[in-house]
């Protein structure tokens, strides 16, 4: 699930989307029980971030333990395809992650990037580490 907030006009930002890691919670997650919540901020000068086609994914989260990529869809953020600068936050939820080795706890972090309708790929940000523990 992805939630978003705020749009503003600013001519000093790039048409290539830019993202910034804000937070990841909880710091310790129970395996298969606790959801992992990540917040990133975004800016995009021409407002073409997001897509209304339900078959197009444009937000990607890579689990650095095993290379599994979670794919999300950001809905179109500007009304009627207007070219306006936008900025805000995305809340990303990863449901109940598991331990991928034979230990009783494991650290994990994620790499995240977005793409826009113009084919521009944002910078990639890395989250801080959290620990997943057996229940």
Can you say where each PLM-predicted feature lies in the sequence?
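C-terminal motif of bacterial Sec signal peptides marking the signal peptidase cleavage site
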Residues: 3-6
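Bacterial signal peptide processing site
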Residues: 8-11
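First exposed extracellular module after export/assembly in secreted or surface-exposed proteins
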Residues: 15-135
